[in-house]
Design a protein with these regions (language model features):
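Catalytic nucleophile-loop/oxyanion-hole region of alpha/beta-hydrolase
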Residues: 84-108
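Active-site nucleophile loop of the alpha/beta-hydrolase fold
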Residues: 145-156
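Active-site loop->helix "elbow" adjoining a glycine-rich segment at hydrolase catalytic centers
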Residues: 119-123
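Catalytic active-site module of serine/aspartate enzymes centered on a nucleophile-bearing elbow/loop
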Residues: 281-307
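Short, surface-exposed "cap/lid" segments of acyl-processing enzymes
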Residues: 30-87
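Serine-hydrolase catalytic core
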Residues: 187-285, 289
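Short glycine-enriched nucleophile-adjacent loop
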Residues: 126-135
Length: 307
């Protein structure tokens, strides 16, 4: 029975993701569509395009909005959304994140093409969940470029778990610092549920591949990398000092796109910026990367563009 004397629904008792959510009591972040009122360098592109921004785990709307502002000041509409972290589901890629909040906003820009800005693996999981939704499976076919910040990675199990442990600690820093003993016990229980689900997910992927299955069917890194409708233009921002999403798998990802899939790739690898902190430390390079992506898209749709 809960505190009101009512029984918990049976489904809540058997779902690792629900156990994680109950332990951490995570708030849902609203998805936001902003119509740019600015007359910027890319206002003409705004007639045909919108920027979709998927945030990193633990980010608040204020932090993600700073990146939306970069596009809105250039004259472009944006949709921004950060999905909740959740325990891994045995249902696989289609249930990695709950994306219902963003559906009505995507419907409002249904007639526009997209440029995507993806942050960390939480953004990748959000993207993969969207692509597995029947109504939005086409999103890559209407996307002209993707900017990747601190992602994507395909980590080995141990660094994978260590990275997630750090992410969870960062997300729930206040609980660790000032929570009651009961809060901290609940936190540890929730974290164990999450990390256990990550181990089970790694085992599920290993069994799938070992029995002849394609890893792109179970692993988001390869699902995106090998997706037949993946757009041709990509910009990467990552760092050799990022301990959460380390540089080697990101480098392997963009090199594969360049060498095997013959796509247009710009890679910006820094040596001093931590996870999702490349813009604060390297604002000039970051803005230039955004401009080059948007200019490339603009010239394709507006051949007479002087940008």
């Amino acid at each position: 029975l809960n505190q009101m004397g009512l029984p918990f629904p049976t489904s809540l008792l058997i779902t690792p993701s629900t156990m994680y959510d109950l332990a951490f009591q995570l708030p849902r972040m609203a998805a936001v569509l902003t119509r740019s009122a600015k007359l910027g360098a890319y206002s003409r592109l705004n007639k045909s395009h919108c920027v979709l921004i998927l945030g990193w785990a633990g980010s608040d709307d204020k932090s993600v909005k700073k990146y939306a502002d970069l596009y809105e000041n250039r004259g472009l509409d944006t949709i921004r959304f950060t999905s909740q972290m959740k325990a891994f589901s045995p249902k696989g890629l289609s249930h990695m994140r709950d994306m219902d909040e963003i559906f009505p906003l995507l419907d409002q820009v249904e007639n526009k093409r997209l440029v995507m800005h993806i942050f960390s693996m939480n953004g990748v999981y959000s993207l993969v969940s969207l692509l597995h939704h029947k109504k939005y499976a086409y999103l890559f076919s209407k996307t002209d470029g993707i900017i990747w910040d601190s992602c994507p990675i395909d980590s080995k199990l141990l660094p994978y778990l260590l990275g997630y442990n750090q992410v969870i600690n960062n997300v729930h820093k206040k609980t660790l610092e000032s929570g009651t003993l009961f809060d901290k016990i609940g936190f540890m229980g929730g974290k164990m549920v999450f990390l256990s689900s990550a181990v089970m997910e790694a085992m599920r992927q290993w069994i799938h591949v070992s029995t002849g299955g394609n890893r792109s069917e179970v692993n988001p890194y390869y699902y995106v990398r090998d997706h037949p409708q993946l757009p041709d233009k990509h910009t990467f921002f990552y760092s050799t000092t990022d301990v959460l999403c380390q540089a080697p798998p990101i480098q392997s990802f963009h090199e594969y796109l360049t060498e095997k899939r013959k796509m247009e790739v710009e890679a910006n690898c820094f040596t001093d910026s931590p996870h999702v902190k490349h813009f604060p430390l390297h604002p000039m390079e970051y803005n230039q990367g955004i401009d080059r992506m948007l200019t490339c898209v603009d010239r394709f749709y507006n051949p007479n563009s002087k940008l």
